Amino acid sequence: VELSDMLIMTAIDNNVVEATEILGDQAGRTLDSITRDAVSAGTNVIYAGGKTSRKTLADEDTLKPILFEKAATQLKAANAPKINGCYVAIINPYTSFDLRTSPEWIEVHKYADTTPIFQGEIGMLGKVRFVESTEAKIWKDETCPEGKAVFSTLVVGLNAYATTKVEGGGLQTIVKQLGSGQDPLNQRATVGWKAIKTAKILVEPYMVRIESLSAYSADVEAN
């Protein structure tokens, strides 16, 4: 983001600080998207409603507790290790809406006193704990029912996937003040970020992707 000297001098707000905050949020979401796209390519898929493909999902094929019982069973059968005693589901806010009215649902505050919670955790079904994220994958293309978005809920065990750790390649926010670089008249400041990030599925049987529709499928776009 480039900021002019006139903007910096005349604006009431500190635009360098604001740009840094906005780019920090964008950087986090971008890096999360890289991980999401990598892990969403797994081969173990359960389609809601007993369907056999994404294209054949219908309006009634929303998330239901039985789907997570099936996912947990598959993970246990594969000897997938648990994370703090449970498997973890990464769920979109739109599809978590479909589960919250289930009688089996346990809100996070009912067990948080005895169990450390994950950031974004919203509740639990059986031995599956749910972490809500807007980065959970959504498709809306020719592979989906016409005009409908399909949502991914990823259920994972320990060591199902990994992300990169490169020395010196972590997220860096870089602020250049007026007069930096090719700016002889001190007219431009810049704020930006850079990072190295990739993700890889390590053990396919240690993750299960559940695909479903939602009450919001007609209104939501892909991410």
What do these predicted ranges mean?
Residues 7, 29, 93-97, 136-138, ...:
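Short loop/turn segments at secondary-structure transitions that flank enzyme active sites
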Residues 80-96, 100-102:
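Aromatic- and glycine-enriched pocket-lining scaffold segments that form the walls
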Residues 6-78, 94, 217, 221-222:
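Alpha-helical scaffold segments that mediate packing/assembly in large oligomeric complexes
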Residues 55-72, 100-223:
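Sequence/fold signature of self-assembling virion shell proteins
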Residues 1-5:
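Glycine-rich, often proline-containing surface loops adjacent to acidic residues and nearby aromatics
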